[in-house]
């Protein structure tokens, strides 16, 4: 069983991984715009100048966090669904994977749900490809379900993928903003049931 630290993103021991983890924590605590490179360096246990050996600055850190997290997330999701034949079960796994990934790392959830979305430049220039890749994974699950006759064929797979993302995104945001420390991954079955009600 993974420990709490192993379950978090960027939990490696290399300087680069430590800097990325520190950036996640500092951005979540202070906000991206208020965060200082010196704070990130201190949290990572490195000199201020060491940050610039790996990254161009705060924006590069934010972009790298998003891109590497998304790439690792999608790789893990695709591995989990690869050997599952039934589309319904694939969708359940995708829902659980989304809520577990962010539900075990509140700082990463804050960065993903809040800090990354403050910048119109970031949203327009850097996030489109990664979001498209995510939606494609979900879309393929829906198409698979339609092809096997499990899911309704009178709904557009891309529209369904966007709706599923919207539901999961709001679940994470609500959990992140809540005063109650509840089990977000524990809600995955109910959320999957709700989504599947519209597809079966």
Question: Where does each model-flagged region fall?
Answer:
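Hydrophobic alpha-helical connector segments
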Residues: 64, 78-107, 161-164
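Amphipathic alpha-helical packing segments from all-alpha helical-bundle domains
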Residues: 71-75, 122-148, 158-162, 170, ...
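Amphipathic alpha-helical segments used for helix-helix packing
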Residues: 103-122, 174-177
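Short hydrophobic/aromatic patch on the recognition helix
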Residues: 45-55
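Hydrophobic/aromatic residues within well-ordered alpha-helical segments
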Residues: 15, 58, 65, 69-73, ...
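C-terminal peripheral helix-coil segments that are non-catalytic and often amphipathic
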Residues: 1-4, 21, 93-104, 136, ...
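Amphipathic alpha-helical linker/stalk segments
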Residues: 7, 65-92, 123, 143
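Basic, helix-initiating cap at the start of DNA-binding domains
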Residues: 1-30, 34-43, 60
């Amino acid at each position: 069983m993974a420990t709490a630290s192993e379950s978090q993103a960027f939990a490696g021991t290399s300087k680069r991984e430590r800097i990325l983890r520190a950036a996640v924590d500092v951005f979540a605590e202070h906000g991206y715009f208020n965060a200082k490179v010196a704070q990130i360096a201190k949290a990572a246990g490195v000199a201020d100048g060491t940050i610039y050996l790996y990254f161009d600055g705060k924006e590069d850190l934010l972009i790298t966090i998003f891109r590497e997290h998304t790439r690792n997330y999608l790789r893990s999701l695709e591995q989990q669904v690869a050997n599952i034949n039934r589309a319904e079960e694939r969708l359940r796994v995708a829902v659980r994977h989304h809520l577990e990934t962010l539900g075990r790392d509140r700082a990463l959830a804050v960065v993903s749900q809040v800090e990354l979305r403050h910048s119109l430049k970031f949203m327009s220039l850097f996030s489109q490809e990664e979001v498209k890749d995510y939606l494609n994974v979900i879309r393929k699950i829906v198409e698979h379900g339609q092809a096997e006759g499990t899911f309704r064929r009178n709904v557009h797979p891309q529209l369904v993928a966007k709706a599923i993302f919207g539901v999961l995104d709001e679940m994470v945001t609500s959990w992140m903003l809540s005063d109650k420390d509840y089990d977000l991954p524990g809600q995955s079955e109910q959320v999957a049931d709700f989504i599947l009600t519209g597809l079966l």
